[in-house]
Amino acid sequence: MQYIKLGTTGLDVSPVAIGAMTYGDPGRGHPVWSLGEDESRPLIKHAIDSGINFFDTANMYSQGSSEEILGRALRDFAQRDDVVIATKLRHPVRSGPNGKGLSRKAIMTEIDHSLRRLGTDYVDLYQIHRNDHSTPLEETLEALHDLVKAGKVRYLGASSMPAWEFAKALHLQRAEGWARFVSMQDHYNLLAREEEREMIPLCLDEGVGTIVWSPLARGRLARAWDDAKATTRSSNDGFADMLYTPLTEQSEDRKSVV
């Protein structure tokens, strides 16, 4: 495996990362098509044996069971210092006040829950899953900075923001001397190329690494077009039809891309 640096950091990561949204208890919420622990573990082990060291999950995936399954597998199959664990927060993980978002309280609470589920005392990359417009950006950024200083987080990242909003966050971090976002996890593939307009040029200019989510367009680019709805996931993944034109409405020009 030829490792690369994440953005302009000194962190070595495999160019292929394993997204663990697919791993989790299907009885514990989104996504309902996730693989249980017995099915997930061989895939995680194969990734490690292949030299992949970069694993990405989130607190909301299968209500935390993705973090639990990934954490147990990594403890069994790898040394902690050899892997890079990334997770995220922002979306609802429980009902009631402060069960979601990027307030200082939510951030301080959710990092501890994620560390417990992952079975580690630090996360390599802690990402905001989306921005939280009900919380002042300064509150969010300072709380994230404090996690780095406390040793619970090594690096900070963001995901799925408008370029102007991400630029504002980077400016505030620089101006205040706070730990900066070193990565942007954005939606980018052959069917979704909007990020080429502003976000990717911004990341190149700022030295921010890009991590792609849905590189295979939630399976649409992974198999023959007529088989695109042939899997349990594809037949139950309504979010895919929100991101992309429904398969039944695709034009011949669209199909030719695949």
Language model features with spans:
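N-terminal binding-site loop/beta-alpha segment at the start of enzyme catalytic domains
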Residues: M1-V83, K149, A217
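Beta/alpha (TIM)-barrel catalytic core signal, keyed to glycine-rich beta->alpha loops juxtaposed to Asp/Glu
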Residues: Y3, N131, T135-V258
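Conserved, mostly hydrophobic/aromatic
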Residues: L6, I18, S40, A47, ...
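Short acidic capping loops at alpha-helix termini that bridge into adjacent secondary structure
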Residues: S14-P15, R80-V83, T87, D121-L125, ...
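Active-site mouth loops of central-metabolism enzymes
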Residues: G24-D38, V93-M108, H129-T135
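Short, acidic/polar
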Residues: W33-A47, G101-L118, F166-H171
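Acidic (Asp/Glu)-rich catalytic clusters
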Residues: D49, A73-V84, L115-G119, V148, ...
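Active-site gating/metal-coordination segments in enzymes
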Residues: R94-Q127, H187, L191-E194
